[in-house]
Structure formats: C-alpha cells, structure tokens
C-alpha cells in the first residue's frame, strides 16, 4: 500500500465512484490529471477527488490527500490509474481526477462522499 493511502476502499464503492465519475464526465465537468486536480482543490471547485494507488513515483500524487483534507474536499482512492483514466474519458491512465460539476451524478457524488467519510 502506498504511503499516501490511509484507508482501504471496498471494491463495490470504487466501482460506484468510477461510475459516478463517468456520469459526471458526460453531464457535468471533470478535471483530469494531477495538476488540474490540484488546481481544482485549491480553487475550491472540486466536489470529489479521485487518486490512483498505483502511481510511480508516489510523490506525484502524495500531496493531494493532504491538500483535499485541508480544503475539506472528500477524496477516494482507486486501485488502477488506467481505470481512473478511462472513467474520466481518457484513452490512457490518470493519476488523479476531480469532479467539479457532478451534473446528473450529483446525488451519487454526495452519497460516495458520505461513505468515504465513514471509512476514514
């Protein structure tokens, strides 16, 4: 388990979160990649942040959970960056992503954020 991962996410919750990311991508707005995700957290526009667990080197995303905590933004870990990238609409993996407008996934994003808080 990477240093920055401080709680385990059940597989069914991860699947639900990735599905919500896909809906948000299609009906709302999503930021993809470490830099875009970091900026959305800092600007207060992120509603839910995704961080991949298989990022090498770990330092690329190590700051994101701490920053999200500081700004009060819920975040979830995803096992594979390929899964995260595909859910965000990329043909390649993504180390991080953020939902900035949930669109039709609004209720799902809130539900996932609540479940993640319970895990912590």
UniProtKB/Swiss-Prot annotation:
**Which Gene Ontology BP terms does the record give?**
ribosome biogenesis; translation; tRNA 5'-leader removal
Instruction: Tell me, in one coarse class, where this protein mainly resides.
Output: cytoplasm
Q: Where in the cell is it found?
A: Cytoplasm
Q: Does the keyword Ribonucleoprotein apply?
A: yes
Q: Which InterPro entries match?
A: eL8/uL1-like, Ribosomal_eL30-like_sf, Ribosomal_eL8-like_CS, Ribosomal_eL8/eL30/eS12/Gad45, Ribosomal_eL8/Nhp2, Ribosomal_eL8_arc
A GO MF annotation of the entry reads: ribonuclease P activity
Which is a Gene Ontology cellular component entry for this protein?
Answer: cytoplasm
Going by the UniProt record, its keywords in alphabetical order are: Cytoplasm, Ribonucleoprotein, Ribosomal protein, RNA-binding, rRNA-binding, tRNA processing
Provide the function of this protein. Answer: Multifunctional RNA-binding protein that recognizes the K-turn motif in ribosomal RNA, the RNA component of RNase P, box H/ACA, box C/D and box C'/D' sRNAs.
Quaternary structure and partners: Part of the 50S ribosomal subunit. Interacts with protein L15e. Probably part of the RNase P complex.
Q: Which NCBIfam families match?
A: eL8_ribo (TIGR03677)
Q: Which family does it belong to?
A: Belongs to the eukaryotic ribosomal protein eL8 family.
Q: What is this protein called?
A: Large ribosomal subunit protein eL8
Which organism's genome codes for this protein?
Haloarcula marismortui (strain ATCC 43049 / DSM 3752 / JCM 8966 / VKM B-1809)
């Amino acid at each position: 388990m990477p240093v920055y991962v401080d709680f385990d996410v059940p597989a069914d919750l991860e699947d639900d979160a990735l599905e919500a990311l896909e809906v948000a991508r299609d009906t709302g707005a999503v930021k993809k990649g470490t830099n875009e995700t970091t900026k959305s957290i800092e600007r207060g526009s992120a509603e839910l942040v995704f961080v991949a667990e298989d990022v090498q080197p770990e330092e690329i995303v190590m700051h994101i959970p701490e920053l999200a905590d500081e700004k009060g933004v819920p975040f979830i870990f995803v096992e594979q960056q390929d899964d995260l990238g595909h859910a965000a609409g990329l043909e390649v993996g993504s180390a991080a992503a953020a939902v900035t407008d949930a669109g039709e996934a609004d209720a799902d994003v809130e539900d996932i954020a609540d479940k993640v808080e319970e895990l912590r």
